[in-house]
């Protein structure tokens, strides 16, 4: 009898765990979609203010329902497939881009809970999948994103779309090298590939290590502009040259999926910047009353500040030429990133500040032992 009882309890446990996981996934997806909608609203409002305009102000109070009106407009538009295009690839491309933009959020920790285990405080991040190779997972997902763009440009049977796709692929591949090396400097200082552990380690570090990694934060931020095809590096979508780039032939929901994927990636890469360089869910200053505010609020506020910088740059800085973009990535950021990897390694070794033995941090994986 006990055998069947154990099978039943295991089955109920699996069902409950699956239900909790499904709820987490749906909560993250809905949050990202709503964030994308109001990021577009924020972008239009900020650019309007910089250009001395009002921005959206008709649909709903203060124009707050404008994103939903835009969504309805895209849904009811006619879906047109270009003549002589590869229809299957043409339809799959936006699905790939949108899906990969959401998959990256699986390892992003939004906050953390603190529990006591054998007299030690252990921090458990609030994340869908707390995997040991979270950083590698993020890099792999971001690298795969270029396939959706390449497929879209090739399958559209349009020279404008194909040139935009080639530009986007070369641009993303070029700046992923710099982004990867900047992340390596953080890994050298923290000693973990788990994003939650990186946040905890950065919080417990001395301030001089934060100053040492500050130039890499600048390189990461500028490279993220190029990685997400944002101004002033939006060469794949140069309206004056390529009309709209790789998505020029798309309309209705396929276009909306590209649009959602682009802005979801924009939020994701700023979430990565907050985790690697700006303290994650911890307050910006180590003051006791600031810890009353939940960590997820600090996490979101930091992302909003970086997104505002993205929008500000779009409204004020002119577009780079393509040769300037490539030169910046390969002749400036790549040498600086390589130099900083060596410099950080040497400084950590010389000052005996290598991770684990330097900070004495109780990490999440201790619960697994």
UniProtKB/Swiss-Prot annotation:
Q: Which GO terms describe its biological process?
A: aerobic respiration
Q: Does the keyword Cell inner membrane apply?
A: yes
Q: List the catalytic activities from the record.
A: a quinone + NADH + 5 H(+)(in) = a quinol + NAD(+) + 4 H(+)(out)
Name the gene for this chain: nuoH
- What name appears for this protein in its UniProt entry? NADH-quinone oxidoreductase subunit H
Q: Which InterPro entries match?
A: NADH_UbQ_OxRdtase_su1/FPO, NADH_UbQ_OxRdtase_su1_CS
- State its Enzyme Commission number(s): 7.1.1.-
What function does the entry list? NDH-1 shuttles electrons from NADH, via FMN and iron-sulfur (Fe-S) centers, to quinones in the respiratory chain. The immediate electron acceptor for the enzyme in this species is believed to be ubiquinone. Couples the redox reaction to proton translocation (for every two electrons transferred, four hydrogen ions are translocated across the cytoplasmic membrane), and thus conserves the redox energy in a proton gradient. This subunit may bind ubiquinone.
What residue ranges are annotated as transmembrane? 20-40, 88-108, 133-153, 179-199, 205-225, 267-287, 293-313, 328-348
Question: To which species is this protein native?
Answer: Ehrlichia canis (strain Jake)
GO CC annotations? plasma membrane
Family classification: Belongs to the complex I subunit 1 family.
Q: What class of enzyme is it?
A: translocase
């Amino acid at each position: 009898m006990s055998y069947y009882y154990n099978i039943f309890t295991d089955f109920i446990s699996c069902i409950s765990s699956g239900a909790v996981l499904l709820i987490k996934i749906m909560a993250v997806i809905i949050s990202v979609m709503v964030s994308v909608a109001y990021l577009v609203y924020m972008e239009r409002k900020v650019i309007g203010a910089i250009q001395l305009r009002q921005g959206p102000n008709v649909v709903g109070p203060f124009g707050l329902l404008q994103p939903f009106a835009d969504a309805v407009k895209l849904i009811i538009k006619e879906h047109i497939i270009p003549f002589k295009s590869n229809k299957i690839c043409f339809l799959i491309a936006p699905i790939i881009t949108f899906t990969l933009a959401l998959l990256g959020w699986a390892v992003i920790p939004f906050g953390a809970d603190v529990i006591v285990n054998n007299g030690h405080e252990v921090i458990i991040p609030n994340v869908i999948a707390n995997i040991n190779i979270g950083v590698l997972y993020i890099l792999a997902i971001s690298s795969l994103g270029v396939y959706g763009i390449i497929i879209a440009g090739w399958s559209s049977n349009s020279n404008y779309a194909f040139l935009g796709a080639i530009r986007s692929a070369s641009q993303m591949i070029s700046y992923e090298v710099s982004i990867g090396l900047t992340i390596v400097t953080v890994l050298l200082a923290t000693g973990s590939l788990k994003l939650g552990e990186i946040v905890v380690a950065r919080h417990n570090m001395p301030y001089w290590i934060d100053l040492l990694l500050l130039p890499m934060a600048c390189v990461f931020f500028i490279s993220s502009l190029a990685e997400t095809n944002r101004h002033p590096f939006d060469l794949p979508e140069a309206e004056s040259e390529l009309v709209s780039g790789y998505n020029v032939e798309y309309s209705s929901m396929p276009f909306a999926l590209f649009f959602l994927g682009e802005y979801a990636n924009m939020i994701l890469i700023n979430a990565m910047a907050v985790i690697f360089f700006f303290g994650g869910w911890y307050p910006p200053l180590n003051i006791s009353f600031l810890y009353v505010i939940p960590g997820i609020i600090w996490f979101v506020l930091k992302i909003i500040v970086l997104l505002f910088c993205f929008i500000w740059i779009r409204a004020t800085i002119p577009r780079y030429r393509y040769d300037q973009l490539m030169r910046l990535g390969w002749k400036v950021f790549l040498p600086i990133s390589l130099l900083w990897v060596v410099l950080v390694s040497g400084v950590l070794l010389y000052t005996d500040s290598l991770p684990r033995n330097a900070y004495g941090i109780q990490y999440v994986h201790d619960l697994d032992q």
